[in-house]
């Protein structure tokens, strides 16, 4: 097998289209039992604290409920609210039996007002009953590789077998934010709709949306056993970071601090530029390969980036601090 490897240190910074100015001081102190900050595009973990602890997640469960519903339902379909969707314990938009709701409106009630009744109505609309919908939710998270997450309901009310980790939840959110409909919903400060002639106004419970211009999502949560939970997202210079804090009293303050510190510490850098050429020689024949889409990562001043080409399998392997991070396909363009 023919392989060529090389190490890219801080010289890589010159390849970036973004000016690099690493921060001298960042503050990662926080009160969370578990926390994780992740880059949405690459999935790189930028900060972690007990990120693999299995913990209750409260209403951050609804992130999964929302993306599963978005991917499996016609959002313009109208449903009639049934008796078993009314009077659900906890936060609610106060659905009434017989009301006619568009699925899209239920999603806003779910994510902005954290309606447990909306979660039940969506589960029934998508899968016919709660059990089948929860099964679909569990299949969804397992397909993403989130093996430390298990769900028993669509709303997050406490159950000892209902849990996630900060890492899993960050990974789920990075996936969900790739969906434009999901992103639009969770970044909305307010949403109005008309239900059977009555105007409903949903105001988002995510306080960071009002106090921090970088914030663009996602979801709050609270139960006595889970404590205060929050998943926040923020963007700057085409970077979007996701932060999960579980059982964290000052959840908004800690989330903003953690994301701000990561935005200061890490800068997007092209590890491999778009249309980068790789040359190999086989029996004196010159073989030229190209990567069609550049590969970039948030990196900090201490990172070691190692790139290895595997021409036999037409792959480029990217190592971050000596651990394999990703593999990228390359194409032969001449022979």
Feature annotation, model-predicted:
Residues 21-167, 171-180:
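Active-site-adjacent loops and short helices of periplasmic peptidoglycan-processing enzymes
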Residues 3-4, 63, 236:
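Hydrophobic alpha-helical segments, especially transmembrane helices
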Residues 146-147, 158-335:
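Domain-terminus/edge residues, biased toward the C-terminal soluble/receptor-binding domains
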